[in-house]
């Protein structure tokens, strides 16, 4: 049997078609209609169509690489399964469901074929499967029914829709747009809509009002043929058929469409429906509310009175009464209604109409209009600004001639936008302007940099706003430089730290150093002060270097006060130590600037004193006005507790020295064990710490030679040295050796051991001082437990000589002053050195090397015996056994005694 190839080929083709259809059906059942495959649904925005059966979803394309006409679209979804379940609950027939679905298909088909700005634009035609139907249109906001409060079939009502309040101006503009669309349908498309109602009027995302719901539309030819014309039949009782409405809503239907004998339909029928819609929008309530009951409808229609129009503006009443007339011939055309005083008397509406056709005007007309709009736009409400004014202005930003006029209005209106609307509507129009702005346009954008920054994400900030600021830094216009410096901090807070250090910070430094305008430098320094909190320490040091270079040439008061602001910011960010090390060295020379007034100087001093106070608090030492440090209470090493009022000098000298100190051959006897000195025995142990000596100064006696020769011309001086007898004195274990038990400094305990404290010089001028030795060669052992726990013994078998060089090098004290006060007053001045005004000898290392020996014979020249003689400063520190000569301002609390009550004197040879 032969095979017919033609028949075989046809059979294969039919099989392939069946397979393809089966695969397509299977895919649709799994993935849904084509709209769901190409677009990703976002949130439901509303509902529309007959009975609000359509669910409206905002959506975006899944394939972002393909060019799209709209960044977002609106997907109309109708769930067949939910519709079927609702039909069963309402006890309706399957025929009613099929009739309703046919109505939906007819509506979508006519909507695709109609192309007009007043008709909803279809992006993707209707597609359906067994479970759903889907249609893709331009982005929408909601239906007018949703805007009037009917949110049936809306799951989660959007925030904007829930709080929506349409102003009368928006209603006027919407009605004017619908009337123009009706004029197109009647005169150009030759269509009669027959179902104009809030459910079939859509508001786009741009704020325009457009028509949909053409399921009941017929051509003008069909309307004139009464044989083919079918009337709508409504019951004489209340019927709730909103689930599957197969007829237009009776509340907006013309009466002639309900006549069963001679029904007629024409353009006037749409005018009546349009009048009902206008009444509902303006009066905020429907004219007819009859629940599809024809009797109630006719009663309301026959008894319409003037009171029914009491809430309608007077300029609209006459036109509205004509539109709602039962006589079709009395009704105006759609074109006639556009000329109503209700529209033409409103200047704001005329402005919106001009904006609708702005792209069609020339630059001269645009310029005149925009100048008038600059004073008028403040009267618009937020919704009108957002949906009616802003979109055409953003589109016109491409016109470089009109940019300086349009941009201020755009930026001001953008302040009322949320972040999403700004990124979708305003930012795309601003991006080309941001990249090319210069002059006044650049200045304006920099002033509104905070607005753009707060309404964009970091990606747009780096790609669009940051290049704008960098161009502003490099611009020569002083106004632009000032503004960009003022806005730098707020922008820097939202940028990465590395971007700030690499892009913004160097340009701020450059403006601070290169500018010759005081305002720019001040703003640059203030910007640096605000940026300190986001920078690290090396960057802060660079800021200080810039300030140092600025203040070297500019010490004006504004610059200096900005410097203080930077210093305060650094102190707050990095603390006292960093500020003391790097900032004080910069601030101190500025205190002498004569440009600072009293208040400004006080602020500078307050800052410096605050730093010093914090350093004192951190060290635990407070220096009073007299220069004496007050140490906070703390426990000593041996467990003794010092009083808070104890004033001690700072200990600097170390006990662990390689060579013995000048006073290591003197012990420090305890006050409690001292014998023969009643004055010193009245003081307690804490008095050892009340001596005013400056141990922070190095010993100035170390420059003297170890051995000196006795003078031959100096008159003899009787020196008495009463060694204090104590029951606790014992012979030393070894001679010429000092044993130190602890490393604590013991210099503060020598104030009680001054061998020259109580000797009254005798008027014996015939002898010369050659040498001094211990009487009878007796060795004394002094022991004392110092506050730091120091215990030492000294063998004083060695003799010590009072050389002429040491005596002649001492400056004579003033005879009118006492060496030390009886009440242990502090002999140190505020700088911690011995007070020269109290008769203390002043020692400097240079005085021993460079000055001539001073004649001190006048001190002892008086033949008059005095009960309390003037003290003589001790010899240099390097001579063994020469007492205390470390430049201290005073000795212990011992007072001089009459010679009769003292022990035998030293032999002065």
Curated annotation (Swiss-Prot):
<comment type="similarity">
    <text>Belongs to the protein kinase superfamily.</text>
</comment>
<feature type="compositionally biased region" description="Polar residues">
    <location>
        <begin position="678"/>
        <end position="712"/>
    </location>
</feature>
<dbReference type="InterPro" id="IPR051177">
    <property type="entry name" value="CIK-Related_Protein"/>
</dbReference>
<dbReference type="GO" id="GO:0035619">
    <property type="term" value="C:root hair tip"/>
</dbReference>
<feature type="compositionally biased region" description="Polar residues">
    <location>
        <begin position="835"/>
        <end position="852"/>
    </location>
</feature>
<comment type="subunit">
    <text>Interacts with VTI11, VTI12 and CHC1.</text>
</comment>
<dbReference type="InterPro" id="IPR011989">
    <property type="entry name" value="ARM-like"/>
</dbReference>
<feature type="compositionally biased region" description="Polar residues">
    <location>
        <begin position="804"/>
        <end position="828"/>
    </location>
</feature>
<feature type="repeat" description="HEAT 6">
    <location>
        <begin position="499"/>
        <end position="537"/>
    </location>
</feature>
<dbReference type="GO" id="GO:0032050">
    <property type="term" value="F:clathrin heavy chain binding"/>
</dbReference>
<comment type="function">
    <text>Probably inactive kinase. Component of the AP2-containing clathrin coat that regulates clathrin-dependent trafficking at plasma membrane, TGN and endosomal system. Together with SCYL2B, required for cell growth, plant growth and development. Essential for polarized root hair development probably by mediating the root hair tip localization of cellulose synthase-like D3 (CSLD3).</text>
</comment>
<dbReference type="Pfam" id="PF00069">
    <property type="entry name" value="Pkinase"/>
</dbReference>
<feature type="repeat" description="HEAT 2">
    <location>
        <begin position="350"/>
        <end position="382"/>
    </location>
</feature>
<feature type="region of interest" description="Disordered">
    <location>
        <begin position="624"/>
        <end position="772"/>
    </location>
</feature>
<keyword id="KW-0333">Golgi apparatus</keyword>
<feature type="repeat" description="HEAT 1">
    <location>
        <begin position="311"/>
        <end position="348"/>
    </location>
</feature>
<dbReference type="InterPro" id="IPR000719">
    <property type="entry name" value="Prot_kinase_dom"/>
</dbReference>
<dbReference type="GO" id="GO:0000139">
    <property type="term" value="C:Golgi membrane"/>
</dbReference>
<feature type="compositionally biased region" description="Polar residues">
    <location>
        <begin position="638"/>
        <end position="648"/>
    </location>
</feature>
<feature type="compositionally biased region" description="Polar residues">
    <location>
        <begin position="724"/>
        <end position="747"/>
    </location>
</feature>
<dbReference type="GO" id="GO:0004672">
    <property type="term" value="F:protein kinase activity"/>
</dbReference>
<keyword id="KW-0677">Repeat</keyword>
<dbReference type="GO" id="GO:0032588">
    <property type="term" value="C:trans-Golgi network membrane"/>
</dbReference>
<feature type="repeat" description="HEAT 3">
    <location>
        <begin position="383"/>
        <end position="401"/>
    </location>
</feature>
<feature type="region of interest" description="Disordered">
    <location>
        <begin position="804"/>
        <end position="909"/>
    </location>
</feature>
<feature type="repeat" description="HEAT 5">
    <location>
        <begin position="465"/>
        <end position="502"/>
    </location>
</feature>
<dbReference type="InterPro" id="IPR016024">
    <property type="entry name" value="ARM-type_fold"/>
</dbReference>
<keyword id="KW-0472">Membrane</keyword>
<protein>
    <recommendedName>
        <fullName>SCY1-like protein 2 B</fullName>
    </recommendedName>
</protein>
<feature type="repeat" description="HEAT 7">
    <location>
        <begin position="578"/>
        <end position="617"/>
    </location>
</feature>
<feature type="repeat" description="HEAT 4">
    <location>
        <begin position="402"/>
        <end position="439"/>
    </location>
</feature>
<feature type="domain" description="Protein kinase">
    <location>
        <begin position="39"/>
        <end position="343"/>
    </location>
</feature>
<dbReference type="InterPro" id="IPR011009">
    <property type="entry name" value="Kinase-like_dom_sf"/>
</dbReference>
<dbReference type="GO" id="GO:0005524">
    <property type="term" value="F:ATP binding"/>
</dbReference>
<dbReference type="GO" id="GO:0080147">
    <property type="term" value="P:root hair cell development"/>
</dbReference>
<dbReference type="GO" id="GO:0031902">
    <property type="term" value="C:late endosome membrane"/>
</dbReference>
């Amino acid at each position: 049997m032969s095979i017919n190839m033609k028949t075989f080929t046809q059979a294969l083709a039919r099989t392939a078609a069946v397979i393809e259809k089966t695969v397509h059906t299977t895919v649709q059942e799994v993935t849904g209609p084509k709209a769901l495959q190409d677009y990703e649904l976002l949130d439901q925005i509303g509902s529309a169509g007959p009975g609000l059966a359509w669910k409206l979803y905002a959506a975006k394309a899944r394939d972002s690489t393909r060019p799209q006409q709209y960044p977002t679209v609106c997907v109309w979804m109708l769930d067949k399964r939910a519709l079927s379940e609702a039909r069963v609950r309402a006890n309706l027939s399957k025929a009613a469901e099929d009739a309703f679905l046919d109505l939906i298909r007819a509506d979508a088909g006519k909507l695709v074929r109609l192309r007009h700005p007043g008709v909803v634009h279809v992006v993707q035609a209707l597609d359906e499967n067994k479970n759903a139907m889907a249609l893709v249109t331009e982005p929408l906001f909601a239906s007018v029914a949703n805007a009037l409060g009917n949110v049936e079939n809306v799951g989660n009502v959007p925030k904007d829709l829930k709080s929506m309040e349409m102003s009368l101006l928006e209603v006027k503009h919407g009605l004017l747009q619908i009337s123009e669309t009706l004029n197109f349908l009647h005169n150009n498309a030759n269509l009669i809509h027959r179902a104009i109602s809030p459910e079939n009027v859509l508001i786009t995302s741009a704020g325009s009002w457009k028509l949909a719901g053409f399921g009941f539309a017929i051509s003008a030819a069909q309307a004139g043929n009464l044989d083919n014309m079918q009337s709508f039949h409504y019951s004489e009782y209340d019927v709730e058929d909103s689930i599957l409405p197969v007829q237009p809503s009776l509340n907006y239907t013309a009466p002639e469409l309900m006549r069963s004998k001679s029904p007629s339909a024409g353009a006037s029928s749409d005018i009546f429906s349009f009048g009902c819609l206008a009444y509902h929008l303006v009066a905020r309530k429907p004219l007819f509310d009859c629940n599809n009951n024809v009797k109630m409808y006719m009663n309301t229609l026959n008894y319409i009175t003037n009171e029914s129009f009491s809430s309608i503006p007077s300029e609209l009443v006459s036109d509205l009464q004509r539109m709602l007339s039962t006589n079709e011939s009395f009704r105006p055309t759609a074109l006639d209604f556009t000329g109503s005083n209700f529209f033409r008397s409103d200047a704001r509406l005329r402005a919106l109409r001009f904006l609708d056709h702005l792209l069609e005007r020339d630059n001269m007309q645009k310029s005149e209009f925009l100048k008038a709009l600059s004073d008028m736009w403040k009267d618009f409400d937020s919704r009108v600004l957002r949906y009616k004014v802003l979109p055409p202005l953003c589109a016109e930003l491409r016109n470089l001639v009109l940019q300086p006029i349009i941009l201020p209005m755009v930026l001001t209106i953008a302040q009322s936008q949320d972040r999403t609307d700004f990124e979708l509507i305003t930012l795309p129009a601003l991006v080309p302007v941001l990249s090319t702005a210069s002059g006044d346009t650049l200045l304006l954008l920099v002033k509104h940099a905070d607005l753009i920054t707060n309404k964009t994400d970091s990606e747009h900030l780096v790609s669009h706003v940051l290049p704008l600021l960098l161009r502003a830094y490099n611009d020569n216009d002083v106004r632009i430089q000032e503004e960009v410096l003022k806005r730098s901090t707020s922008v820097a807070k939202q940028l990465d730290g590395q971007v700030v250090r690499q892009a913004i910070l160097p340009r701020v430094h450059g403006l601070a150093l290169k500018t010759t305008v005081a305002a720019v430098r001040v703003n640059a320094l203030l910007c640096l002060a605000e940026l300190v909190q986001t920078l690290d320490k090396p960057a802060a040091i660079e800021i200080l270097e810039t300030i140092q270079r600025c203040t070297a040439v500019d010490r004006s008061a504004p610059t200096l006060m900005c410097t203080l602001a930077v210093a305060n910011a650094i102190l707050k960010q990095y603390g006292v130590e960093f500020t003391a090390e790097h900032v004080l060295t910069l601030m101190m020379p500025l205190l002498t600037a004569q440009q600072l007034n009293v208040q400004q100087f006080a602020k500078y001093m307050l800052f410096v004193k605050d730093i010093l106070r914090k350093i004192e608090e951190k060290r635990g030492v407070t220096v009073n006005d007299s220069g004496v440090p007050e140490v906070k209470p703390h426990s000593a090493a041996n467990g003794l507790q010092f009083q808070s009022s104890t004033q001690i000098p700072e200990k600097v000298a170390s006990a662990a020295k390689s060579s013995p100190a000048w006073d290591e051959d003197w012990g420090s006897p305890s006050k409690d064990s001292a014998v023969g000195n009643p004055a010193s025995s009245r003081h307690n142990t804490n008095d050892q710490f009340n001596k005013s000596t400056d141990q922070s100064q190095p010993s100035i006696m170390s420059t003297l030679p170890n051995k000196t020769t006795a003078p031959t011309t100096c008159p003899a001086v009787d020196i008495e040295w009463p060694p204090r007898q104590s029951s606790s004195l014992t012979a030393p274990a070894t001679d010429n050796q000092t044993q130190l038990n602890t490393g604590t400094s013991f210099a503060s305990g020598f104030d009680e051991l001054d061998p020259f404290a109580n000797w009254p010089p005798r008027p014996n001028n015939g002898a010369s001082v050659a040498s001094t030795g211990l009487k009878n060669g007796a060795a004394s052992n002094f022991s004392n437990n110092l506050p730091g726990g120091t215990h030492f013994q000294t063998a004083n078998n060695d003799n010590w000589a009072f050389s002429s060089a040491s005596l002649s090098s001492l400056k004579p004290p003033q005879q009118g002053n006492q060496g030390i006060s009886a009440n242990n007053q502090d002999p140190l001045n505020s700088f911690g050195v011995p007070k020269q005004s109290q008769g203390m000898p002043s020692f400097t290392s240079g005085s021993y090397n460079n000055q001539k020996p001073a004649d001190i014979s006048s001190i002892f020249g008086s033949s008059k015996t005095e009960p309390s003689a003037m003290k003589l400063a001790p010899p240099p520190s390097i001579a063994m056994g020469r007492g205390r000569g470390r430049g201290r301002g005073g000795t212990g609390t011992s007072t001089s005694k009459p010679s009769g009550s003292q022990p035998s004197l030293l032999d002065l040879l």
